Amino acid sequence: MRKFWSMLAVLGLGVVVTMCSRAEQKEKDVKKADTRVFELRTYYAAPGKMDSLNARFRDHTCALFKKHGMEIVAFWNPSDPKEADKKLIYVLAYPSKEAADKSWKAFRDDPEWIKARDASEKDGKLVDKVESVYMNPTDYSPMK
């Protein structure tokens, strides 16, 4: 009978340890989600350059973002026809602001990016202006 109670105690301890471990992992996952940072970027294309800007993203930039740990959330053009050929809007996600800074530095220093940028701008700059806003999700946001 003593063996039975000893085994039951060990089994119970194992269950408690497993539950605590799972709770701890869930807490880490929540904290990780809470620290994710999003970046909203708006590019104002140079006149007549939106097609070239979209091509550069499609053919080069997106792959380089992924290479440097930049999670692409989505890309948009405004639905207003007057603005559609002027703006490219997109959102990236990162584990933290520090990770974003590190990723952008690596991206900008990447010889593949420099080559793609220079080739795409042989007939002039594609972008007149860039706006960037880093954002943290609210506690009620469905996306974190």
Predicted regions and their residues:
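Bacterial N-terminal signal peptides
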Residues: L8-V16
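A short, glycine/Asx- and small/polar-enriched loop/turn
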Residues: E83-L88
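An amphipathic, aromatic/His-enriched active-site/gating alpha helix that lines ligand/cofactor pockets
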Residues: E24-D34, A55-V73, P81, A93-Y134, ...
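Short, surface-exposed ligand-recognition loops at beta-strand->loop->(often short) alpha-helix junctions
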Residues: A45-N54
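Bacterial N-terminal signal peptides that target proteins for export
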Residues: M1-A9
